[in-house]
């Protein structure tokens, strides 16, 4: 499971900036199965895999199924200019919103 100590290793202020510019378009509304930011029940099934795995999937991209619906996240949220650190900060920011 993910703890506050896990997310506090990341730059959460930078994560919010990256989120606002790149991630909110899907995660604010829950588009394509994206877990809605700030909605704990949408994140609870993902948290047990750990923050590092969640970041890896966000960097590499992810295709799967959630409650019978297909989900898809392009690598780095579709912005190849983002660094792995920026993606990590953004994921940590989103997770922090539900801890």
UniProtKB/Swiss-Prot annotation:
Highest taxon of the lineage: Bacteria
GO molecular function, one term: heme binding
Record-linked InterPro entries: Cyt_c-like_dom, Cyt_c-like_dom_sf, Cyt_CIE
Keyword Transferase tagged: no
Family annotation (Pfam families): Cytochrom_C
Disulphides: none
Post-translational modification: Binds 1 heme c group covalently per subunit.
PROSITE patterns documented for this protein: CYTC
Protein's UniProt keywords contain Phosphoprotein: no
GO biological process, one term: photosynthesis
Official protein name in the record: Cytochrome c-555
């Amino acid at each position: 499971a993910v703890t506050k100590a896990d997310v506090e290793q990341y730059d959460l202020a930078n994560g919010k900036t990256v989120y606002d510019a790149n991630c909110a378009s899907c995660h604010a509304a829950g588009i394509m199965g994206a877990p809605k930011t700030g909605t704990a029940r949408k994140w609870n099934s993902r948290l047990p895999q750990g923050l590092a795995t969640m970041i890896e999937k966000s960097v590499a991209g992810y295709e799967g199924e959630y409650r019978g619906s297909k989900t898809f996240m392009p690598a780095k949220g579709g912005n190849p200019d983002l660094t792995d650190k920026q993606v990590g900060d953004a994921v940590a920011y989103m997770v922090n919103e539900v801890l």
